[in-house]
């Protein structure tokens, strides 16, 4: 059984036992979080949401918080000695999908 959930402005296909990296959640490590925006549930029977599947939830356990690899944003203007360098590390939360309730 799998589901498509929406979290952090992104849609993710998840299965039970899967580890996923999502946008940072306001939860402590070891906490259980519930995703209510379930757009699709697949398996033996298929449930398609309009826009979400009513009564369907996905529960997950927070494993850790962290920051992704640094990306460099560099902009310049040719021949004008104008250079700006900026780095960014996006925070994330690693969760393990425990149960899909449909």
Curated annotation (Swiss-Prot):
GO CC term (a single one): ribonucleoprotein complex
GO annotation (BP), single: translation
Protein's UniProt keywords contain Ribonucleoprotein: yes
Pfam families tied to this protein: Ribosomal_L21p
Keywords attached to this entry: Ribonucleoprotein, Ribosomal protein, RNA-binding, rRNA-binding
MF (Gene Ontology): rRNA binding; structural constituent of ribosome
Thylakoid recorded as keyword: no
Matches recorded under PANTHER family: 50S RIBOSOMAL PROTEIN L21 (PTHR21349), LARGE RIBOSOMAL SUBUNIT PROTEIN BL21M (PTHR21349:SF0)
Entry function: This protein binds to 23S rRNA in the presence of protein L20.
Name used for this protein in its record: Large ribosomal subunit protein bL21
The species this protein was found in: Geobacillus thermodenitrificans (strain NG80-2)
Organism lineage string: Bacteria, Bacillati, Bacillota, Bacilli, Bacillales
